[in-house]
Amino acid sequence: MATERYNPRDTEPRWQQEWDARKVFETENDDPREKYYVLEMFPYPSGRIHMGHVRNYTMGDVVARYKRARGFNVLHPMGWDAFGMPAENAAMERGVHPAGWTYQNIAAMKAQLKVMGLSLDWSREFATCDPAYYQRQQYLFLDFLEKGLVYRRQSKVNWDPVDNTVLANEQVIDGRGWRSGALVEQRELTQWFFRITDFSQDLLDALDGLEQWPEKVRLMQKNWIGRSEGLALRWALDPATVPGETKELTVYTTRPDTLFGASFLAISADHPLAREAAAKDAAIDAFCEECRRAGTSLAALETAEKKGIDTGIRARHPFDPEWELPVYVANFVLMDYGTGAIFGCPSGDQRDLDFARKYGLSVVPVVMPKDADAATFTIEDEAYGGDGVMINSRFLDGLSTEEAFEAVASKLEQETLDGAPRAERKVNFRLRDWGISRQRYWGCPIPVIHCEDCGVVPVPKADLPVTLPPDVTFDKPGNPLDRHPTWRHVACPQCGKDARRETDTMDTFVDSSWYYARFTAPWEDKPTDPKAANHWLPVDQYIGGIEHAILHLLYSRFFTRAMKATGHVAMDEPFKGLFTQGMVVHETYSRGEGAQREWVTPAEIRIDEIDGRRRAVLIETGEEVAIGSIEKMSKSKKNVVDPDDIIGSYGADTARFFVLSDSPPDRDVIWSEAGVEGAHRFVQRVWRLVGEAAESLRGAKASPAKEGEGLAISQAAHRTLRAVEADYDKLAFNKAVARIYELVNVLAAPLTQVAAGKADQAVTAAVKDATTILIDLIAPMMPHLAEECWREIGGEGLIAERPWPTFDPALVVENEITLPVQINGKKRADLTIARDADQSAIESAVLALDAVKAALNGASPRKIIVVPQRIVNVVV
């Protein structure tokens, strides 16, 4: 009998070698079985995997192993999102080359992932910094350029003064660079852009079809795309107040119904009218410069103090030429949204109200709630931005906001200003084109050449890849490619004259926007093999963090459309199913306070519990340290647990089982040593129970019992099988874990009975069937333990290649049913009764319930309504 403790250090490497030797997880594209593509967001090669990686990749692995067992041809690849600033920072700080640093990290992290026992097809592995990968990315760029999906223009950009590069709007968080944390500046640079806005409406409309995406992510993308319907409205300017030749100002508004509440107009610092005013007024010029130094992102504008300067220009109200409004330059108006000009209605918008209070502008309520009184309705500290009834709005009074919108739009569409309609209905989007130019070395080179005679010339595809020169230095800030003595100098492909290469590289989000397609045929000379891509895509289940809801996921959706437009794929959407997992979090520990606070790692402390109070003390000195909040594991707070330590101490299966067991997969999991030890005890318990009975089970035939002593065992196993199937299908891993715990509790006594030789043939057969089901159920989560148990009971072949078991329908039928019992329509109790009980038996059982007795108080019910198999209602 196998009574020794389970030793993962022995078993896990052995089974990993067996899987590798048999190439169990290598996938053939021409396999006739139904396909299933599961993909976790590939990692940045920082050098170490963390527990968040363990959870993410374990979830994907459970899905891959389960679907493989269900008969699917599963594609489960892995690669590396390998370009980016950290490699350049390492080059500057440590004097190493980004390529060497990156590939060294990849080797270390690959070894860590291998130890986890993941069912990955490593034959498809690539890193985005491989020239073979970015050659095909450059190919896509040239196809997009030819299709008109790429263009180049002067643009105000977010400049990160620490990383010395341009950031997309989405990469500016609260006015700071998403990676460096530096305050972002604005600069004018010539940039390359992808025309993502060509797909704005389609990207928005198609969200409704992504039924297997979290609603939260779809809503975030919808808000980011930001479709709005409104009016482009032309305001006449008082010529006596205009410093130049401009006669009118066009404003985009989504609330033309509030026109009679307008008290000012505001324009962007980059609006032509603002430039005219700045040319004549030093104070306006200085204010415009201040605005330009702020970030360009909406987030930056929303968090900044709202400021403006009166230009002295006056605009005439569209419905009353005698009514003039001041025109301000304001720091919250974006030139690239709408027309770069707005009108402010302080009573209907909080930002406008704050601005009006600050600069002493009038506040006139024009919309009130339907149940409010116009005579008493006022605006104090909060604007009213909801729907309602129009007031103080002349011919609009009494109309609803929707009716007023139509009335204003229709009236102004018919009126003219200088021979053209005063207003035009417009649809606007918040989404901006994607600026991809980055002034750095460690990225995919943009494959164009600049020639004085020919202009911008694409690099011929035959000359791809444009590779990065290895001989660069990082002793100065900025882009080393700009300083390279030879790389940037090249002959023009068209005229042969001296020309220069584009020295900007692509935003690293480009690299991750199509990698899922490359995995379908990474050996292909072109970016994709359309046959393979169209077979495998869309990805059936994509797993990653919700922090990528906008950036990566939206860019990938654009890329799939652009690749379809250029003939590389046939579908619009990259990911059919999306799951956003929670984080792994841990307590924080520290000593000292304020600037003297020093964070302490979990490995350095011991937790003592004295009189119900938890104390953390340093193992080395016994000094007590403070127990802080539970937070996402981070290097800065040192509340990290090294996966190598956990796997080294407990084994990969324990680590995998714990990260799946403790909480729903979309919620954060709190890491605790006690939880890990509990998972490890369960691993040992399963091994002990199966191992002790293994000798008796080896020669037995597996057969579920239909009656007698073994019936309850078989019912428990087959019901658990059916339930866990449903849990795996829904990615409800924690529920599956709970059911497996219950099944082991049921099997404990029978397995002990079999081990002792006290079970008859029928019970032994039922126990072997149930044990086989248990092994199949744990295999996706704890694959090494499952293989070891399977071998121990005499199973043939590998569990990793074994088909999923089928439950016996006769054994999963529940003979009892629980009916909710209502009294006068309100639920008061539950009744558990035989499923085939007739109405008379149900009524008798209901009348015997304490809650019903109390309600009747000795009287008879007026009526008992029984809805078969559903509900009972007692009418008193």
UniProtKB/Swiss-Prot annotation:
Domain of life: Bacteria
Top-rank EC class of the record's enzyme: ligase
Signal sequence, start to end: none
Keyword Magnesium: no
Motif 'HIGH' region per record, residues: 43-53
Cell location: Cytoplasm
SUPFAM superfamilies: Anticodon-binding domain of a subclass of class I aminoacyl-tRNA synthetases, Nucleotidylyl transferase, ValRS/IleRS/LeuRS editing domain
Keywords annotated in UniProt: Aminoacyl-tRNA synthetase, ATP-binding, Cytoplasm, Ligase, Nucleotide-binding, Protein biosynthesis
Main location: cytoplasm
Enzyme Commission number(s): 6.1.1.4
GO cellular component, one term: cytosol
One example GO MF annotation: ATP binding
Short motif 'KMSKS' region, span: 632-636
Residues noted as binding ATP in the record, renumbered to the chain: 635
Alphabetical list of HAMAP family matching this protein: Leu_tRNA_synth_B (MF_00049_B)
NCBIfam families attached to this UniProt entry: leuS_bact
Similarity comment: family membership: Belongs to the class-I aminoacyl-tRNA synthetase family.
Descriptive protein name: Leucine--tRNA ligase
Organism: Sinorhizobium fredii (strain NBRC 101917 / NGR234)
